[in-house]
Each structure stands twice: as C-alpha cells, then as structure tokens.
Amino acid sequence: NDISFEVEKGSIFSIVGPSGSGKTTLLGLCAGLDSPSAGNIELCGSNLNDLDEDERALLRNKEVGFIFQNFQLLPTLTALENVIVPLELQGEKNASKVGKELLEKVGLADRMHHYPSQLSGGEQQRVALARAFSNKPTILFADEPTGNLDEETGEKVIQLLFQLNKEAGTTLVIITHDLELANRTQQILRLKGGKIVSNEKTLAV
C-alpha cells in the first residue's frame, strides 16, 4: 500500500515486521519474482515493468542472488553441484574450480561431496551462501536466513554472510523479524499491514 523506498548500492538494508506484514511479498516484487498491481520497480538499472518474464529471469540470473530460510538446495545434488549449477547456467568454464573455492571459503572443503540430507542446517545454509555469491550478484536478497537455525549457528552464518558481502561489495537486502540483526544493517525499513511504518538509517557501518 503506497510503498516507496530506495536501497543504496553496496549497502546492507533490512526489512522487518511481524508475520503477515508483507515482507516476503515485498521481496518477491523487488526481485522481479512477482509483478506489482500498480507502480514501478527498478532493479539494477532496469524497470521491471518493461521486462517480460524471460527478460526478468535473465536479469535475476545475471544480477541477483538469493538466500532462503529453508535453504532451497537440490536434494539429488551434492554441495558442490548445488553451487556449480548457476555457474554452468552462466557459461562459466571453470565452474568446478570456482565452486570448490567458494565452498572452501565458507568452511566446507571437506563436505563438498556430501548431499544436503548429510549436512546439518548450518552447513546447508553455508552451501546456500556459496551458491548465492557464485554469480557475483549486484544485489543479494536474504529471506529470514537464520530462521531455521539455532542462535549460535545463526550467528556464525550471519557473520559469514556479512564477511562475504563485504568482500564482494554486493548490495544486501535482509528480510527478518530479528531486530537485533536488523540493527546491524545500515538501514531498516519497518512494515506493518503492508504499509511502511518507518524507514531509518542506523549507526551500523
């Protein structure tokens, strides 16, 4: 309902609100997964209203990364194969080498040939992190990235997410109900009932 905001390039931005406030719906719209009933959405310099579904898919494949609460790993593929898939779709000739380097970076050098069912929740989310950064996205959307993890594991995943993001210079948008996590981002957009309650910068660097 009359939602308007901008996310600065290279910043870490959070969208918070109670269940049913519209957080995930808003993420879907911003990422071009859904179409708005009114208004315009610009993503990485492209007006999504001007693109058809195939063109939006190409834009996402090239510019956008995703991290989901339930990991969204392909169960019949190993950790390495899950990371390699988007690289191969982009025609990366050294997909296997890049995938191995990413899994080493997230601390899974000894688990890359394991299947998701053989990995803990924290390990699965680290595979998801490696996959999300594999195509060097301009912007990364993380939907409740620690929602299925215990507090200690969730903290390790967030530290890793922030570290990888800093190295890559990616714009990061986090959907969360965790205000403590939101306060570590540079800007917080608060939603309630599908409307913006506040949009404030924080002291986080």
Where are these regions (language model features)?
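ABC family nucleotide-binding domain
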Residues: 1-191
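H-loop (His-switch) and adjacent beta-strand-loop-beta switch element
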Residues: 188-201
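ABC ATPase nucleotide-binding domains
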Residues: 203-205
